C-alpha cells in the first residue's frame, strides 16, 4: 500500500518520513567559515554561561570578512612584487599600509614579516641646485 516513491511517506501516511539531507549552519548563512566549530569554541571557552544561536553565526561572518580583506590586500601586495604565492611579508605590507587594519593589528607581530620601507625626509638628498638657484635669483632682483 505504498503511495509512491516521491511522496516521502510509507504505508498510506503511516511510518517515518524519509530523512532529509542535513544542511550546515554555515551554508544556511552563506558562509565559508565553520559556524558549528565556532559555536563549540564559544561554549567550551567559558566566555559566558550560555551562548545564543546567532552569536556564532555573527562571529563567523566577522572573521570571514576580516580574513577576506587581509587576503585580498596581501594578494595585491604579492602581485605588486611579481609573486604568485602569499608569504608573511606580503601580509605585513598589506596590514601596515592599510590604516584601519594597522590600527586593529597595531600590537601584533607578524613572524617573518619584516618592516615597512621608510626613509625620513631629512635624510633624503635635497635638490641643491634648484633651491640655491631660486634664492640667488630672488636676491639678484632686489
UniProtKB/Swiss-Prot annotation:
GO terms for cellular component: extracellular region; nucleosome; nucleus. Residues 1-12 have a biased composition (Gly residues). The keyword Phosphoprotein applies. The modification Phosphoserine is found at residue 139. InterPro entries: Histone-fold (IPR009072), Histone_H2A (IPR002119), Histone_H2A/H2B/H3 (IPR007125), Histone_H2A_C (IPR032454), Histone_H2A_CS (IPR032458). It is found in: Nucleus; Chromosome. Expressed mainly in roots. One of its GO terms (molecular function) is structural constituent of chromatin. Phosphorylated to form H2AXS139ph (gamma-H2AX) in response to DNA double strand breaks (DSBs) generated by exogenous genotoxic agents and by stalled replication forks, and may also occur during meiotic recombination events. Phosphorylation can extend up to several thousand nucleosomes from the actual site of the DSB and may mark the surrounding chromatin for recruitment of proteins required for DNA damage signaling and repair. Widespread phosphorylation may also serve to amplify the damage signal or aid repair of persistent lesions. Residues 1-28 are annotated as: Disordered. CDD domains: HFD_H2A. Keywords: Chromosome, DNA-binding, Nucleosome core, Nucleus, Phosphoprotein. A motif ([ST]-Q motif) lies at residues 139-140. The keyword Transmembrane does not apply. It comes from the Eukaryota. The [ST]-Q motif constitutes a recognition sequence for kinases from the PI3/PI4-kinase family. Belongs to the histone H2A family. The nucleosome is a histone octamer containing two molecules each of H2A, H2B, H3 and H4 assembled in one H3-H4 heterotetramer and two H2A-H2B heterodimers. The octamer wraps approximately 147 bp of DNA. Interacts with numerous proteins required for DNA damage signaling and repair when phosphorylated on Ser-139. Variant histone H2A which replaces conventional H2A in a subset of nucleosomes. Nucleosomes wrap and compact DNA into chromatin, limiting DNA accessibility to the cellular machineries which require DNA as a template. Histones thereby play a central role in transcription regulation, DNA repair, DNA replication and chromosomal stability. DNA accessibility is regulated via a complex set of post-translational modifications of histones, also called histone code, and nucleosome remodeling. This is Probable histone H2AXa. It comes from Arabidopsis thaliana (Mouse-ear cress).
Amino acid at each position: 500500500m505504498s503511495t509512491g516513491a516521491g511522496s516521502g511517506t510509507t504505508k498510506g501516511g503511516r511510518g517515518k518520513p524519509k530523512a532529509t539531507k542535513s544542511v550546515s549552519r554555515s551554508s544556511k548563512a552563506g558562509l565559508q567559515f565553520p559556524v558549528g566549530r565556532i559555536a563549540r569554541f564559544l561554549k567550551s571557552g567559558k566566555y559566558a554561561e550560555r551562548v545564543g544561536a546567532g552569536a556564532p553565526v555573527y562571529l563567523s561572518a566577522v572573521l570571514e570578512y576580516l580574513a577576506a580583506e587581509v587576503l585580498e590586500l596581501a594578494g595585491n601586495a604579492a602581485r605588486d612584487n611579481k609573486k604568485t604565492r602569499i608569504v608573511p611579508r606580503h601580509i605585513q605590507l598589506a596590514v601596515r599600509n592599510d590604516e584601519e587594519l594597522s590600527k586593529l593589528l597595531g600590537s601584533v607581530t607578524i613572524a617573518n614579516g619584516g618592516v615597512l620601507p621608510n626613509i625620513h625626509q631629512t635624510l633624503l638628498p635635497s635638490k641643491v641646485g634648484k633651491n640655491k638657484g631660486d634664492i640667488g635669483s630672488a636676491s639678484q632682483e632686489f
